[in-house]
Every structure is written in C-alpha cells, then in structure tokens.
Amino acid sequence: MKIMLTEFFNTFVKVTGWLPQKIAFRTKIEYEDKAVQGRRIKGPAIIISNHTSVFDYAVLLFVFFTRTLRVQMAEVLFQKQPLGLFLKMMGGIYVNRDTHDFSFMGKSEELLRTGKVVGIFPESRLPLKNEERPLPFKPSAAYIALAADVPVIPVYTNGSYFNLKKRAHVIIGTPMNVHDFADDARSEKENIDRLTNAMRERIIRLGRMLDDTANEKK
C-alpha cells in the first residue's frame, strides 16, 4: 500500500509539475548511445549523477519520467518542513551523514531487489566553489550495486537551472555492468574501490562528451 501511494504521489507531482519544470529547466537531453540506453529504464537499476544543486533531483524525475525514482537524500533536507514531508511522500531514502547508520544501504538494496530504480549522488554533498568537480565518490553506491547485482546508469548534468541564457543539459550514459568489476580473485573492498573509481571516471567522461557536443553546436 505504501509503495502504491508513493508511486501515485510521484505521478501526480510529475504530471502537475511538467509545465513548470519545462520553463525552469528547459532540459536538453543527450545520449552516449540512445540505442543502448534512452530515457526508459527496464527493470531494477541504479542511477548515479554528479551533484550541482538540490534541483538535480527534480531534473532526474522528469528525465526518467516513466519510472518512480527512489533517491538517497541527506538528513538536512528532511529537517526542513514542509520539504521533509514532501520528500518522504516522494519515497526519498533518508541518509544521515552525521552518524554510522547504514540502514539506507539496506533499504536501497531491498528496493532494487523488488525491481525499483534507486538514484544516488555518490559525491554525497554539493561541491564548494573552488573544489574540483566531481568530488571523490563515496563507496556506498558501488557496494549497493554489487550486492544487488544491478546495472548502474551514469548521468551528467551541467546544472544550468533557472537560467534564461543557458538551458539545462543532461547526458545519459550507457549502463555499467557490475559483473565487470566483481573479480573473485580480489577482496570485496578492492572490487568496491574499482567500481567506485570507474563510476567517477564515467561521470567525468560524460561531462567531457557534453562539453564537446555543446562546442560542436556553436
């Protein structure tokens, strides 16, 4: 019943928010290979994305319109009302970065095992002004992907929201097969580290591809 209510509320928000988000973001979607991975996601998957703004979440909702995204969210967002209630109704996965509570990982794995799509921002926070982007990735996304044995879909956004001169650009990458990083000859930590590093490299590569596409169109 709770899952049905979450999916209903997501659908309501996306239908009623479609026009406002078109005006606010004007999102242009590019693809690494559309024949392999477009906007439709079949079966369980993890979406990873670079993190530029709290509005990254909203953009992902509409990029992958046909699926209900269960996105990991920091505790600070749930502490602000009525935002916290809204995110809870949207099915946000509570992540408390100030404690050693890893229940969000079990919750994410459980959702994936029932065919759902989980969204993760592996940087775990917004970069500061002078920090190199993307920030180093936390290992939890790789751990969950390997444990649940699901593909990882990388997404890069330029973070240009509410900008009349420059629209939002998003590029969807081809899925990463976690089996390529699950080597029985290595330790669990080594496999997690390999996948974590590979995910960050894919995000960086997608960012460069998006920049190249933008330069070609000038």
Region roles according to the model:
Residues 27, 67-69, 90, 116, ...:
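A structural micro-motif
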Residues 33-40, 109-110:
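Short amphipathic alpha-helix with an adjacent loop that forms part of the alpha/beta core around
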Residues 4-8, 105-218:
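Non-catalytic C-terminal accessory region of glycerolipid acyltransferases
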Residues 1-34, 81-90:
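A transmembrane-helix-recognition feature enriched in membrane-embedded lipid enzymes
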Residues 39-99:
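Catalytic core of membrane glycerolipid acyltransferases/transacylases, capturing the structured
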Residues 98-101, 134:
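A conditional alpha-helix N-cap/helix-loop micro-motif detector
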